[in-house]
Regions:
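Substrate/ligand-engaging "lid" and interaction regions
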Residues: 1-44, 48-528
Length: 528
């Protein structure tokens, strides 16, 4: 069983389907021919998340028979991905959704019609220019990570041949401008708040520099700013797509699926002909398009207003997912866990995040309307976090915790204060913040040391709690005032919020000695 059998037509469909593989229900070659002539969508970033989500939902849309164009992928960073993960398989891939019950769903993705290297050294660049000049193009999109939208003075100074992704995109938009100021929507699909603004800032930085240097007419910048021509909508995307999993490779090999080799590029991109991802997924997109759009709603995407996209993001990062992640990661590191899924088998930790979510954060949740917060958090607790296929670690999530606490917990505390709600309902959120002062010591509950995860404020905050010792009977905890009064770390001055003394008391319990973290966690969770 090989992907190229599907491309050649030499495929025993009954065998594939008997083994649980969903095959494309559309004419792959007809879609490619149509897309080559009248492209509608170019996506930048050919990594695992693209194949597992945007390409997969377009595949679902094509399977309905109500749409007939594919997506053209362009890689700006790691060109080996095109050579090794796309070209040998005629741009086909296998999407494997990993279910929390240990089963897997297998779907052949055939929606990618071309895979191009987005750089001037390749002939693919001329193909991209040709596509950008085509009036049929409706949308370009991105999964290049938040770092992919950055730029620097050196690249801005390279003129019309920059090397950073945003510069290349600006150069292609210049081609579209020169072809008659054709309309287009520039859509980020990266997992960061207000992602459309990040693309916009990057593109505008290059355009403004080029205008200032006299390389392009001022009308080009006017074109980019004209929202009847060019828009930069926001979106919220949520789907975990880890590197190819050994267990998945073994399951596919048992089926007789032969395209299961791991690929590691020189730039250390980990990929394969298959991509594995969690089963749960969300894509909510601001419906602000200037030249029509691919009907991704046929594959499950939600189109809505910018305000609603922002509400979905707020629901996720302040209530239904991110606070739970951080709480269990702080305590998970101290209790010696290395897998989030393993933490979910710990009754104290599972109850801890359930009660934070349902009892403390939910009373002030932002309800976006298009997604139900209770269904969302239910999927997080019952399907996403316990998923045995997800190799996520508390140590990874604990990275940059000082930068995350203001949003993940500070916003909830602010809402309690603004609405005059009873702060006595806040017990486990304060326990999370108390746990941070214990986490900073880098000592597990069994007394052994651990390395706190990288954080730009780690040394500064560790210095504040340096006078404290785990297991010392009598000690001065006044240093905590310098920590919990920091609105830059917690979103609010916790003493002004009326929570500082409560948190101090919890810290004292956590510092009592070996076993105190477990004892304190159990005490407060059980009493809730």
């Amino acid at each position: 069983m090989k992907l190229n059998d599907i491309w050649s037509g030499n495929v025993n469909a009954a065998e594939w389907e008997a083994k649980g593989y969903e095959l494309p229900k559309f004419d792959i070659k007809a879609v490619r021919e149509k897309t080559a002539k009248e492209p509608t969508w170019v996506h930048f970033g050919g990594g695992n998340i693209f194949r597992a989500f945007p390409a997969a939902i377009l595949n679902d849309a094509l399977n309905t028979g109500k749409y007939d164009r594919g997506v053209i992928v362009a890689e700006t960073f790691d060109f080996e991905v095109i050579d090794k993960a796309y070209a040998p398989y005629n741009n086909l891939s296998l999407c494997v959704n990993l279910c929390s019950d240990g089963s897997i769903e297998k779907k052949v993705i055939a929606s990618v019609t071309e895979a191009l290297k987005a750089d001037y050294q390749f002939t693919d660049w001329q193909r991209l220019v040709e596509i950008f000049k085509n009036p049929s193009l409706q949308m370009i999109s991105f999964t290049i990570t938040e770092k992919g939208y950055t730029y620097n003075d050196a690249d801005l100074a390279r003129g019309l041949t920059p090397v950073f992704a945003m510069g290349k995109v600006c150069a292609l938009l210049l081609e579209r401008f020169n072809a008659g100021q054709l309309p287009l929507t520039v859509q980020s699909m990266d997992n960061c708040s207000h992602n459309g603004d990040k693309v916009k800032a990057g593109v505008f930085a290059y355009a403004e520099k080029w205008v200032a240097d006299g390389l392009v007419p001022a009308a080009f910048l006017d074109y980019l700013k004209d929202e009847t021509k060019i828009t930069f909508p926001w979106s919220m995307i949520d789907k975990i797509t880890p590197r190819p999993h050994e267990k998945v490779k073994e399951m596919l090999a048992t089926d007789g699926f032969e395209d299961n080799d791991y690929i590691e590029t020189e730039k250390h991109t980990f990929t394969a002909p298959f991509v594995n991802a969690e089963e749960v997924q969300y894509l909510v997109i601001e419906d602000n398009y200037t030249n029509g759009r691919p009907p991704l709603n046929l594959g499950g995407a939600l189109y809505t207003t910018r305000e609603t996209v922002d509400k979905v993001e707020t629901m996720k990062v302040t209530t239904c997912l991110n606070p739970l992640h951080t709480a269990m990661s702080i305590y998970g590191c101290m209790l010696g866990y290395t897998l989030i899924s393993a933490e979910m088998a710990d009754d104290d930790l599972r109850s801890f995040i359930q009660k934070i979510g349902y009892m403390e954060a939910m009373p002030v949740v932002t309800d976006p309307g298009v997604l139900n917060p209770y269904e969302f958090i239910g999927a997080v607790i019952n399907r996403r976090l316990p998923n045995p296929f997800m190799p996520d670690a508390p140590q990874r999530i604990a990275m940059d915790t000082s930068q995350k606490l203001p949003i993940r917990f500070g916003e909830t505390i602010k809402k309690y204060l603004a609405r005059g709600l009873d702060k006595s309902n806040l017990v486990l959120i304060p326990l999370t913040l108390a746990g941070y002062a214990r986490y900073l010591k880098g000592i597990k509950d069994d007394g052994t040391s651990f390395e706190p995860s990288p954080d730009p404020m780690l040394a500064e905050l560790q210095a504040i709690v340096a006078p404290l010792e785990v297991g010392k009977a009598e000690q001065d905890y006044s240093c905590l005032k310098s920590l919990y009064s920091r609105a830059d770390v917690f979103g609010v001055n916790l003493y002004d919020a009326g929570l500082g003394e409560q948190i101090e008391g919890m810290v004292k319990e956590l510092y009592a000695g070996n076993g105190a973290v477990r004892k304190t966690l159990h005490k407060y969770v059980a009493a809730r």
